[in-house]
Amino acid sequence: MVQGTTSDAGKSTLVAGLCRVLYRRGVRVAPFKPQNMALNSAVTSDGGEIGRAQAVQAQACGLLPHTDMNPVLLKPNTDTGCQVIIHGKVLANLEAMAYHAYKPKAREAVLASWQRLREQYECIIVEGAGSPAEINLRQNDIANMGFAEAADCPVILIADIDRGGVFAHIVGTLALLSESERKRIIGFVINRFRGDIALLQSGLDWLQQETGIPVLGVLPYLRNLHLEAEDAVAKDTPDKPQTWLRVIAPVLPHVSNHTDMDALRMHPHVDFQFIELNEPVPPADLIILPGSKNVRGDLAVLASHGWRDKISRHLRYGGKLMGICGGFQMLGRKIHDPHGLEGDAGSSDGFGWLDMETTLTKEKHLKEVEGKLTFADAVVTGYEIHMGVSSGPALERPLLHIGTQAEGALSEDGQIAGTYLHGLFDHAEATQAWLNWAGYSQLKQAQETIAHYDYLALREASLERLADEVELHLDWNRLQSYL
């Protein structure tokens, strides 16, 4: 089991790397995260949803994602509550105290999934959540040491040296663990190191002498590693000598599946930027309104920061606008939440750029789809994760067809598009069509390079590169005895 001294210490990345190393060695390996709090999710082979990080880890193992890999998924929709998903299906929206009371049952779900995976695979690499030293969350813990003790897992503790204070993080974490929990830790991994390793060695020697626990390895700071973030919006972009199209998206308070933008963020000729709500909106070819776990709430925040006027000005100057999932719902005239699924029950005015209304329903739509665009000869594959049903004249001009079923909407002038599909930019052919729609096709030289850009192949190459680094920098002789 990989646990971290903090959130974003590198747990997801290390698990993916370990999984790919073992997969390359012929081991039947699977990832597992007992409890995940994240707004980025993926549709599974058994028709549920799990955190996207576990879907990437499944790919590292050569597997399709399955709900047993992440039996408890928490998707925050307010500051004090979240949608609770058990074995891929929505249980309920629960406030924090109500979920705390539910934890014993959640633990049963976690252990049931764990047992099924144990029966199918030779090795399971488990990912913890946050930090194991959260004193207020120790009771009924199912995410970190509580699970490790129940499943009798050895633990690797990973810490991020790039943010500073790595030795304090490690020693402080150990000080807050019980004796039995400390004994589970078989070694430390220092993550995101840049510089001369010789200058770090005295600290590593002190750490091992002080704690009696070995340092299993020091992983370098890996730039341009194209793996989807578990939750935090990734704002760093690779160096791009020449870009021909600018795309922006606002950072919504409850943004979900912002990993839709990763392919654009990494595209060599697209200048993609996430824009904070209070920042000036730069001139752009395309504005994308991303998904949201609280559509009405995020819509109100967008309006309060003047984004209606900002987007209207963008449209007046000929820019394109796209809404994905919750962002699609915002483009309509009204959004109704009669059951209070995402906050207080009621209705809100949308931006009104598409003539449609959306009603949030208790049933969640989860499926992988393949369709054909209506404005280009291109096949689109993606997945749906939403709880809304939209209706209105705008849907009579669909954005794509999934078999005989119409999906999404495209305005009469072709300037505004909306869809429930996530993963729109992951495939080269579809990406070319979307970017041509946004203005890319007007640049002849762009046609020579865009078809060769394949985000899925880039992710696979990143997993291989990550595995190479993990294999090179970790003490596999010591690790092998625990696998």
Swiss-Prot record:
<dbReference type="InterPro" id="IPR002586">
    <property type="entry name" value="CobQ/CobB/MinD/ParA_Nub-bd_dom"/>
</dbReference>
<keyword id="KW-0169">Cobalamin biosynthesis</keyword>
<dbReference type="InterPro" id="IPR027417">
    <property type="entry name" value="P-loop_NTPase"/>
</dbReference>
<feature type="domain" description="GATase cobBQ-type">
    <location>
        <begin position="244"/>
        <end position="430"/>
    </location>
</feature>
<dbReference type="InterPro" id="IPR047045">
    <property type="entry name" value="CobQ_N"/>
</dbReference>
<comment type="function">
    <text>Catalyzes amidations at positions B, D, E, and G on adenosylcobyrinic A,C-diamide. NH(2) groups are provided by glutamine, and one molecule of ATP is hydrogenolyzed for each amidation.</text>
</comment>
<dbReference type="InterPro" id="IPR033949">
    <property type="entry name" value="CobQ_GATase1"/>
</dbReference>
<dbReference type="InterPro" id="IPR004459">
    <property type="entry name" value="CobQ_synth"/>
</dbReference>
<comment type="pathway">
    <text>Cofactor biosynthesis; adenosylcobalamin biosynthesis.</text>
</comment>
<dbReference type="GO" id="GO:0009236">
    <property type="term" value="P:cobalamin biosynthetic process"/>
</dbReference>
<dbReference type="Pfam" id="PF07685">
    <property type="entry name" value="GATase_3"/>
</dbReference>
<dbReference type="Pfam" id="PF01656">
    <property type="entry name" value="CbiA"/>
</dbReference>
<dbReference type="GO" id="GO:0015420">
    <property type="term" value="F:ABC-type vitamin B12 transporter activity"/>
</dbReference>
<feature type="active site">
    <location>
        <position position="422"/>
    </location>
</feature>
<keyword id="KW-0315">Glutamine amidotransferase</keyword>
<feature type="active site" description="Nucleophile">
    <location>
        <position position="325"/>
    </location>
</feature>
<dbReference type="InterPro" id="IPR029062">
    <property type="entry name" value="Class_I_gatase-like"/>
</dbReference>
<protein>
    <recommendedName>
        <fullName>Cobyric acid synthase</fullName>
    </recommendedName>
</protein>
<dbReference type="InterPro" id="IPR011698">
    <property type="entry name" value="GATase_3"/>
</dbReference>
<comment type="similarity">
    <text>Belongs to the CobB/CobQ family. CobQ subfamily.</text>
</comment>
<dbReference type="GO" id="GO:0003824">
    <property type="term" value="F:catalytic activity"/>
</dbReference>
